[in-house]
Amino acid sequence: MPRRREVPKREILPDPKFGNVDLSKFMNVIMESGKKAVAERIIYGALETVEKKANRDPLEVFITALNNVKPMVEVKSRRVGGANYQVPVEVRPVRRMALAMRWLKESARKRSEKSMAQRLANELLEASEGRGGAMKKRDEVHRMAEANKAFSHFRF
């Protein structure tokens, strides 16, 4: 394919209930097979549960959870002289957000509660308090970067 120009980023509209763009992006991450109404029901159900359990603004809990899960550094493989090194690199802001959303979704899926809305609600609550599967994943990525700090001079 020709590489003439940079493809413009799509404008994502804020979600109808809270008017938040990040929540709208998260809805797209949760969505499967183009079923946006189902994803919407899951997310709004989860946020209602969060409000009941935590007695806090659900949007605030969601944003706190996202910010807690965002990774600062990650490792990338780099081949130097016949050996592969795991080189720690800083994560770009857009990727940081995407990874946080993906990890929240994955760790919510792995939970044992009945409905996805309940799983997501509990995962968001735990992540906002610095616990849970998504936080574990973030800490693991940070630990890998810390362990391979010696190779940080092999920058990309």
UniProtKB/Swiss-Prot annotation:
Name of protein: Small ribosomal subunit protein uS7
Keyword Ribosomal protein attributed: yes
One GO term describing the cellular component: small ribosomal subunit
GO molecular function, one term: tRNA binding
Family per similarity comment: Belongs to the universal ribosomal protein uS7 family.
Function: One of the primary rRNA binding proteins, it binds directly to 16S rRNA where it nucleates assembly of the head domain of the 30S subunit. Is located at the subunit interface close to the decoding center, probably blocks exit of the E-site tRNA.
Short name of one Pfam family: Ribosomal_S7
